[in-house]
Regions:
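An aromatic/glycine/proline-enriched structural segment found at the starts
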Residues: 4-16, 188, 220-221, 225-286
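Residues that act as N-cap/strand-start positions at coil-to-secondary-structure junctions
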Residues: 36-38, 108, 265
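Short acidic-hydrophobic surface loop/beta-edge motif
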Residues: 42-47, 269-272
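Peptidyl-prolyl cis-trans isomerase
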Residues: 147-150, 206-208
Length: 286
């Protein structure tokens, strides 16, 4: 095929024909699958049932820890959807020894980060630290995990922020598409048909006691997996994680998921939003 391209010569644009031997009338054959070599890793289980997986990665002097508690949105009753996400937001606030601002200042001094998030199937605590500052960062992680302080003022503020975000999303094409797609795929009444952030009417009735109970009942050892990746050996990191044995040694019962709609034919759904600056497309099936 031939393509025309304009080129500049002494300030004047000249048309030059570019010859291409690529056949665009047929799909090219896929190349060989790349060989993926998994790094060596180690596994262990603490006395309270926590599974830990780790791998040495010494390219840069950092350590990353990811704590994943199964549950999240799945542990919520339908009338209080958004509880897991709101609890995670509250855990990012004050602790027994630090205000939220002071906690972030300490992290900044260390060049570290700690965050708590909740999704459709779990709550995750993520930590990143320079190797030389690992001990100090782990002390802050322990503080965040065991000494988070929940206050009515924080609940009111964070709940209102979430509600305002949900209201704003009603005008965003991407959010509209995601919300409609979830309900079509999973069906009304399915937990995954609702955003983990919850809905306005469910958020409004969540109490401080709900937050406290959810934190205590969901962050338990039997649903926790820990991943450690970074510039540290197994025999060095495990003693530093001894504080994890203080996590309650108990499990929780995850609710069974209802069946999803059976889709037997291709169907096109159109959401008309006049003057929208962009279009969104979602394609999928269960």
């Amino acid at each position: 095929s031939q393509l025309s391209r304009l080129e500049s010569s002494n300030g004047n644009l000249e048309e030059r024909v570019v010859v291409s031997a690529f056949d665009r009338s047929s799909q090219p054959q896929a190349g060989p699958s790349p060989l993926v070599i998994m790094p060596e890793y180690w596994e262990t289980t603490l006395d309270n049932g926590i599974d830990i997986i780790g791998a040495l990665s010494d390219e840069i002097p950092t350590v990353n820890i990811r704590m994943s508690f199964d549950g999240g949105h799945l542990l919520e009753s339908p009338e209080k959807y958004g509880l897991a996400s709101l609890t995670a937001d509250m855990m990012n606030e004050n602790t027994g020894n630090f205000t939220s601002e002071a906690f972030e200042i300490e992290l900044d001094k260390l060049g570290s980060s700690i965050s708590v998030t909740a999704g459709s199937q779990g709550t995750t605590i993520s930590m990143r630290s320079l190797s030389r500052n690992l001990d100090a960062t782990l002390e802050l992680l322990e503080e965040r995990l065991f000494s988070s302080v929940f206050t009515e003022d924080d609940l009111i503020r964070l709940r209102q922020q979430t509600i305002e975000s949900i209201e704003a999303d009603k005008e965003e094409p991407s959010s509209i598409a995601a919300n409609v797609y979830r309900e079509l795929i999973y069906g009304a009444g399915h937990p995954f048909a609702v955003s983990p952030a919850g809905e306005i009417d469910t958020l409004e009735i969540i109490t401080l006691e709900d937050i406290q109970n959810f934190s205590r009942q969901s962050l338990v050892s039997q649903v926790l997996d820990v991943i450690v990746i970074g510039d540290i050996e197994q025999d060095e990191i495990l003693p530093k994680l001894d504080f994890l044995t203080n996590i309650p040694n108990q499990g929780i019962e995850l609710v069974g998921l209802p069946s999803t709609p059976v889709i037997t034919e291709n169907t096109l759904y159109l959401i008309d939003k006049p003057l929208a600056p962009q279009s969104e497309i979602r394609i999928g099936h269960m």
